[in-house]
């Protein structure tokens, strides 16, 4: 249960598995907030304090589900009109959410779980591929949408690109 935009300040069930794409409560901020995965940090901190494996199990299950069910828009031409249509709308892949995911939630997954059984093997490979995909989207499409580099969204998107580079310096 999370309190998110559109829920009237009341905790709402986001699904098990999480429904990442359905716009609920007639508020686009709800979908965007769910896809920022801000609740992961609290679970990772709880794991660090308690050692209770239910927390990283839930975070990695949600991450695996998101990667499997929310593919990046494919074959988007590198022009401003197509970039806006693909990455500046109510979807899990709106550029602002792509950036925020990298520095606010996926960075925390990397920070807390790297070197553990929770982020190893094939799961780490899927995670690294998804981070690289996020970095590609941010590096190609954010400058197309904000060509004058004059928008606060671009700052958060570029911060996401920085954190993606910090997570995968050899990619």
Briefly describe each language-model feature range:
Residues 10-11, 17, 27-171:
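Aromatic-lined, polymer-binding surfaces characteristic
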Residues 1-20:
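Low-complexity, Ser/Thr/Pro/Gly-enriched N-terminal "stalk/linker" regions
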């Amino acid at each position: 249960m999370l309190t998110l935009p559109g829920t009237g300040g009341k905790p709402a069930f986001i699904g098990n598995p999480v429904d990442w794409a359905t716009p609920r409560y007639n508020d686009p901020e709800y979908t965007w907030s769910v896809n920022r995965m801000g609740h992961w940090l609290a679970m990772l901190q709880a794991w660090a304090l308690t050692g209770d494996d239910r927390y990283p199990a839930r975070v990695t299950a949600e991450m695996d589900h998101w990667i499997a069910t929310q593919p990046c828009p494919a074959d988007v031409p590198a022009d401003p009109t197509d970039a806006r249509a693909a990455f500046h709308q109510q979807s899990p892949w709106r550029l602002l959410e792509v950036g925020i995911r990298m520095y606010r939630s996926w960075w925390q997954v990397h920070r807390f779980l790297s070197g553990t059984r929770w982020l190893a093997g094939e799961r780490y490979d899927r995670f690294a591929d998804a981070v690289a995909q996020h970095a590609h989207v941010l590096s190609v499409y954010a400058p197309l949408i904000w060509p004058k580099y004059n928008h606060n969204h671009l700052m958060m998107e570029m911060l996401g690109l920085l954190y993606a580079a910090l997570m995968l310096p050899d990619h």
